[in-house]
Amino acid sequence: MQVKKIKKRKKVNFFQKNNIKYIDYKDVELLKKFISPNGQILPRRITGTSLKDQRQLALAIKRARQMALLPYVIE
């Protein structure tokens, strides 16, 4: 049997690519891209965001949840 080699594509930081400096908690459509189907915040290794952007993203998602713009759990 021959083993297939899987090429991993390089993850690109979405916020640097689109020149987004500030992640707004009121931009719900943007934040939904970084939430799993269960409602959890996706980690950096999956999204490809930088450390600084991931911190801002997590803070924005938590603020949106607190303001009831995003649900805590999706059923």
Curated annotation (Swiss-Prot):
Keywords: Ribonucleoprotein, Ribosomal protein, RNA-binding, rRNA-binding
InterPro entries: Ribosomal_bS18 (IPR001648), Ribosomal_bS18_sf (IPR036870)
UniProt GO BP: translation
Transmembrane segments: none
One Pfam entry name: Ribosomal_S18
Superkingdom of this protein's organism: Bacteria
Keyword set includes DNA repair: no
Entry-linked SUPFAM superfamilies: Ribosomal protein S18 (SSF46911)
One example GO MF annotation: small ribosomal subunit rRNA binding
GO cellular component: cytosolic small ribosomal subunit
Subunit structure of this chain's protein: Part of the 30S ribosomal subunit. Forms a tight heterodimer with protein bS6.
Family recorded in the similarity comment: Belongs to the bacterial ribosomal protein bS18 family.
Functional summary from the UniProt entry: Binds as a heterodimer with protein bS6 to the central domain of the 16S rRNA, where it helps stabilize the platform of the 30S subunit.
Name under which the protein is recorded: Small ribosomal subunit protein bS18
Species per Swiss-Prot/TrEMBL record: Mycoplasma capricolum subsp. capricolum (strain California kid / ATCC 27343 / NCTC 10154)
Gene that this polypeptide is encoded by: rpsR
